[in-house]
């Protein structure tokens, strides 16, 4: 029997070059490349900006991103460039897939060329020291532009393989939401809308913490009961923290919350899961990071969120235990102990507050 592929069910997209959206993705990592490829497949006039000119030239010649997605052929219409001005001038939407530590610097560089373009973050993380989320940085560096954030359970290799997936575009602007949906929505990739920018962004950033925890647990061969407890208590931590930040806790019931948390915590494809597994296998953070060869946002997020949680007095035992394991030399089993302490608490505290237990 021939192997079934979802892509076999999909009709080719009819392209109208006169009305095609002009999309640029900044960042040539796995997720940025996957989104650029989706936009190109949907008939958008699509560029991807990559710092290294040789890599950009290689992608244009081979239509393969050999470093991040070596097993997939990219759309022939997708153009890679290394010149920032060329990448962002006269475009409709700029999708920014830059690691959080470089996000602000890249926005500063493109600021002189931004006129009416919408800027949408694809980055899941927080800026070190400032505790700024990517939407905060967009507002600070490009105060006049319409903006949004894209987040969801989006493992790049699955998207490239044509497996049905979904994501969330969050923006205060209905026009931005519609434009991003138009650019990326397809028969195999569904794009939902939200106006809770901070909630969607928090879900995407915070879940990286718990993917590290699940990776460590996998190295210890934890059972299904324990995995379920990590997932649900992680969701409780995320919701508590989000409320303190002004987000709607109900947002965490959607794709950008529990959906992203489930996918990232259960997939060996996740960078944060991989680095957790390496740590649980006895490697140091330096060794694990070197082996991975890509940025794992969860490590920085653990540091930033732990500090903010202490400042805001938010109860986050898993996050605190992870910090102690990674940075203070505590045994990894401390994470399991963090799930079991502090006695009688309610399961869903927005339904039954702790003081009523």
UniProtKB/Swiss-Prot annotation:
Keywords: Cytoplasm, Lipid biosynthesis, Lipid metabolism, NAD, NADP, Nucleotide-binding, Oxidoreductase, Phospholipid biosynthesis, Phospholipid metabolism. It holds the Pfam family NAD_Gly3P_dh_N. Its EC number is 1.1.1.94. One of its GO terms (cellular component) is cytosol. The active site is at 207 (proton acceptor). The keyword Nucleotide-binding applies. It comes from the Bacteria. SUPFAM superfamilies: 6-phosphogluconate dehydrogenase C-terminal domain-like, NAD(P)-binding Rossmann-fold domains. Its main location: cytoplasm. GO terms for molecular function: glycerol-3-phosphate dehydrogenase [NAD(P)+] activity; NAD binding. It catalyses: sn-glycerol 3-phosphate + NAD(+) = dihydroxyacetone phosphate + NADH + H(+); sn-glycerol 3-phosphate + NADP(+) = dihydroxyacetone phosphate + NADPH + H(+). Belongs to the NAD-dependent glycerol-3-phosphate dehydrogenase family. Catalyzes the reduction of the glycolytic intermediate dihydroxyacetone phosphate (DHAP) to sn-glycerol 3-phosphate (G3P), the key precursor for phospholipid synthesis. This is Glycerol-3-phosphate dehydrogenase [NAD(P)+]. It comes from Acinetobacter baumannii (strain ATCC 17978 / DSM 105126 / CIP 53.77 / LMG 1025 / NCDC KC755 / 5377).
């Amino acid at each position: 029997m021939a192997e079934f592929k979802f892509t076999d069910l999909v009709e080719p997209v009819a392209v109208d070059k006169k009305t095609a959206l002009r999309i640029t993705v900044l960042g040539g990592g796995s997720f940025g490349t996957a989104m650029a490829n989706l936009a190109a497949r949907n008939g958008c006039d699509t560029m991807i900006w990559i710092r290294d000119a040789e890599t950009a030239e290689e992608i244009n010649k081979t239509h393969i991103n050999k470093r991040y997605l070596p097993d997939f052929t990219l759309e022939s219409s997708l153009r890679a460039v290394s010149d920032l001005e060329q990448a962002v001038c006269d475009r409709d939407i700029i999708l920014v897939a830059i690691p959080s530590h470089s996000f602000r610097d890249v926005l500063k560089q493109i600021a002189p060329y931004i006129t009416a373009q919408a800027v949408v973050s694809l980055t899941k993380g927080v800026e070190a020291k400032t505790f700024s989320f990517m939407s905060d940085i967009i507002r600070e560096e490009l105060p006049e532009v319409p903006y949004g954030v894209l987040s969801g359970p989006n493992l790049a290799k699955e998207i490239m393989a044509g497996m049905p997936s979904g994501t969330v575009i969050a923006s205060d602007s209905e026009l931005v939401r519609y434009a991003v949906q138009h650019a990326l929505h397809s028969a195999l990739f569904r794009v939902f809308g939200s106006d809770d920018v901070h909630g969607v962004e928090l879900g995407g950033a915070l879940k990286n913490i718990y993917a590290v925890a699940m990776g460590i647990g996998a190295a210890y061969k934890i059972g299904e009961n324990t995995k379920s407890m990590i997932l649900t208590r992680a969701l409780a931590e995320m919701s508590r923290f989000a409320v303190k930040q002004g987000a709607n806790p109900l947002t965490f019931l959607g794709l950008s919350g529990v959906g992203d948390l489930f996918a990232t915590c259960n997939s060996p494809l996740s960078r944060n899961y991989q680095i957790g597994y390496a740590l649980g296998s006895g490697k140091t953070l330096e060794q694990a990071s070197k082996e991975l060869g890509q940025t794992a946002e969860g490590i920085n997020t653990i540091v930033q969120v732990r500090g903010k949680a202490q400042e805001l007095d938010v109860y986050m035992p898993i996050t605190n235990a992870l910090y102690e394991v990674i940075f203070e030399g505590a045994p990894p089993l401390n994470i399991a102990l963090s799930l079991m302490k502090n006695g009688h608490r309610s399961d869903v505290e927005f339904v039954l507050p702790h003081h009523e237990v």
